[in-house]
């Protein structure tokens, strides 16, 4: 029997309900005062390390709404890279870079016991501060500033008074950059989201704090640092389902003035920041992605802006976002959203769903915090991985954790261990020998679509059915835990009852494109509307040549601007163009769309299938 030391800090638990209080998140209308009890059961070897202040795993007990809850916490070991650095500037403009020791940090992810859908992102630096999801509702917790007291406030997000109810939105900037490795051709295969989600990836992340942000927080770099660490801990929690880690490689404070022109136009600020990163920052510090956080209020209620599908690019792997709220989780969601654009994910349309009212990639900030990506986001991320092959995300940064001897049986996978499922009495992993923390000799696999009870599934077992006419079903090979990469039918094969032709695994139809652009109120597409594309005016054209809008020839008119029949509030519009002044290249008919029998759109022309493919 493993020797275990039980450490318990017993504190009185008196839940107290108050009517109103001013907390870090703002004025809170309804809250509870609780006194968490820390109960930690760890092997003696794991806790007797004098250099380690914060345990790898902890438990706290307290009450919410009069019911006891147990909060399980585990340290986020991928929050920092080994070479993490901070930069600020002296009054005479000199760059000063330090490498602070952050080997024993206090930022955790967690869950509530007996709630399978619970999540938590918590700082345990000075009491418990952060948020957790319990029975589908988001709660915030923070210590009260009472001397010699362990009192904490627990409150629902909905009980925070909101000062600004204006609709906030995200911008998105599309790129046409060519990656260092060419984008895979359309005939190549897509890999599955399952394969990619469960392969670990790392975005070595750099944050720049502009002078407005620095001044807004009273030039207190320590307070800003803590705020950013808490925010990034939540961003990491959001991306965990896709097995993406976002370790912080560096933090820079523009203490003496901005190094670019930060203006109210998010578009201009992003362009300047991307150019500065390419020209300056990358020459000083290796990283995969950088974002600027600013206290500037961007035009048009924009909270942030990022390039789409640009991860790993020297200029375009960037974003800018606003310090827009006292509520840390909301700024974290904004950053996670902008980072999603860098990963090739566009805004959700009405048909996209997740388990909450709004999803991460909604174009507008929801009045309820959400940490879930939609089904659409998952598909787009999957395609980005295959088409762009972002190699910078594959390398694993060195961890900053104190290297201590592995302790078999503590439930944490450490160096020299193949598995760790806890004590033999508690182990529920059939693949793991709990006594040695090694896999059983007969184990072929641990997880995967083609793995069952630690062995490969039989060859021919269906692991992914065909999604539609353009997709193909895949079966297990019998010698791998992974479902084979997702193949699709050749471009040009008829699909959707001959209404279209397959293109890159999809069946592009103008009706679906209209609904993606305008929403569920689209009622159809009237072919006669496409004759407007012969005009060659502001929005009606087939393509651009040297910035000039080229009118469509009659044979090409179905390959220019998209027109939709739309009905809303009783009004019917038959030829509504899909056009946005600030993104005029969006709303064109998609490549591969059928424009006649045996013909598809290609670069603004209607061409024969054998020419297109």
Swiss-Prot record:
One of its GO terms (biological process) is proteolysis. Residues 21-194 form a propeptide. The keyword Mitochondrion does not apply. Expressed by the venom gland. Zn(2+) binds at residues 337, 341, 347. InterPro entries: ADAM_Cys-rich, Disintegrin_CS, Disintegrin_dom, Disintegrin_dom_sf, MetalloPept_cat_dom_sf, Peptidase_M12B, Peptidase_M12B_N, Reprolysin_adamalysin. Glycans are attached at residues 219, 375. Ca(2+) 1 binds at residues 204, 288, 392, 395. It is an enzyme of class 3 (hydrolase). Its cofactor is Zn(2+). GO terms for cellular component: extracellular region; plasma membrane. Keywords: Blood coagulation cascade activating toxin, Calcium, Cell adhesion impairing toxin, Disulfide bond, Glycoprotein, Hemorrhagic toxin, Hemostasis impairing toxin, Hydrolase, Metal-binding, Metalloprotease, Platelet aggregation inhibiting toxin, Protease, Prothrombin activator, Pyrrolidone carboxylic acid, Secreted, Signal, Toxin, Zinc, Zymogen. It is found in: Secreted. Snake venom zinc metalloprotease that possesses high hemorrhagic activity. It inhibits collagen-induced platelet aggregation and activates prothrombin (F2). This is Zinc metalloproteinase-disintegrin-like EoVMP2. The lineage of its organism: Eukaryota, Metazoa, Chordata, Craniata, Vertebrata.
């Amino acid at each position: 029997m493993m020797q275990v030391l039980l450490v318990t800090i017993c504190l009185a638990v008196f839940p107290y309900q108050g009517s109103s209080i001013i907390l870090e998140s703002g004025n809170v209308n309804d809250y509870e005062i609780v006194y968490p009890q820390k109960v930690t059961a760890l092997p003696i070897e794991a806790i007797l390390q004098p250099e380690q202040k914060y345990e790898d795993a902890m438990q706290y007990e307290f009450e919410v709404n009069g019911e006891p809850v147990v909060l399980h916490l585990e340290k986020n070991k991928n929050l920092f890279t080994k070479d993490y650095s901070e930069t600020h500037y002296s009054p005479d403009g000199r760059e000063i870079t330090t490498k602070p020791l952050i080997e024993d940090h206090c930022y955790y992810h967690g869950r509530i016991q007996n709630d399978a859908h619970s999540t938590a992102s918590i700082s345990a630096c000075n009491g418990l501060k952060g948020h957790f999801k319990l029975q589908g509702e988001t709660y915030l917790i923070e210590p009260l500033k009472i001397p010699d007291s362990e009192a904490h406030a627990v409150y629902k997000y909905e009980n925070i008074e909101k000062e600004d109810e204006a609709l906030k939105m995200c911008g998105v900037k599309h790129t046409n950059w060519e990656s260092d490795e060419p984008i895979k051709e359309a005939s190549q295969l897509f890999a599955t989201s399952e394969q990619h989600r469960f392969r670990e990836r790392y975005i070595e992340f750099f944050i720049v704090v502009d002078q407005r942000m620095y001044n807004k927080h009273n030039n207190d770099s320590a307070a800003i640092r803590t705020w950013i660490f808490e925010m990034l801990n939540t961003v990491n929690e959001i991306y965990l389902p896709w097995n993406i880690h976002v370790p912080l490689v560096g933090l820079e404070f523009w203490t003496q003035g901005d190094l670019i022109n930060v203006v109210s136009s998010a578009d201009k600020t992003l362009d300047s920041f991307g150019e500065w990163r390419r020209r300056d920052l990358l020459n000083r510090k290796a990283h995969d992605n950088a974002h600027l956080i600013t206290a500037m209020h961007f035009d048009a209620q924009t909270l942030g802006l990022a390039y789409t599908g640009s991860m790993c690019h020297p200029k375009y792997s960037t974003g800018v976002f606003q310090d827009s709220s006292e509520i840390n989780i909301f700024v974290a969601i904004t950053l996670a959203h902008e980072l999603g654009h860098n990963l090739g994910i566009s805004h959700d349309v009405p048909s996209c769903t997740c388990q909450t009212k709004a999803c991460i990639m909604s174009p507008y900030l929801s009045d309820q915090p959400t940490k879930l990506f939609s089904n659409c986001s998952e598909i787009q991320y999957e395609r980005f991985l295959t088409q762009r092959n972002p190699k910078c995300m594959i390398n694993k940064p060195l961890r900053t954790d104190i290297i201590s001897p592995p302790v078999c049986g503590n439930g944490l996978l450490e160096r020299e261990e193949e598995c760790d499922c806890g004590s033999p009495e508690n182990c529920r992993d059939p693949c793991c020998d709990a006594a040695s923390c090694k896999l059983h000799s007969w184990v072929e696999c641990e997880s995967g679509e083609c793995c069952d009870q630690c062995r490969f599934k039989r060859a021919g077992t269906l692991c992914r059915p065909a999604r539609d006419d353009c997709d193909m079903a895949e079966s297990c090979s019998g010698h791998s835990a992974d479902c084979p990469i997702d193949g699709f039918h050749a471009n040009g094969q008829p699909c959707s009852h001959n209404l279209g032709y397959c293109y890159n695994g999809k069946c592009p139809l103008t009706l679906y494109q209209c609904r993606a652009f305008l929403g569920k109120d689209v009622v159809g597409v009237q072919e006669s509307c496409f004759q407007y594309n012969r005009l060659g005016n502001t929005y009606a054209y087939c393509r651009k040549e040297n910035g000039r809008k080229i009118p469509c020839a009659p044979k090409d008119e179905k390959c220019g601007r998209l027109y939709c029949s739309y009905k809303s509030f009783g009004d019917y519009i038959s030829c509504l163009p899909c056009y946005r002044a600030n993104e005029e290249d969006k709303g064109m008919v998609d490549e591969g769309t059928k424009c006649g029998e045996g013909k598809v759109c290609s670069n603004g022309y209607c061409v024969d299938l054998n020419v297109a493919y």
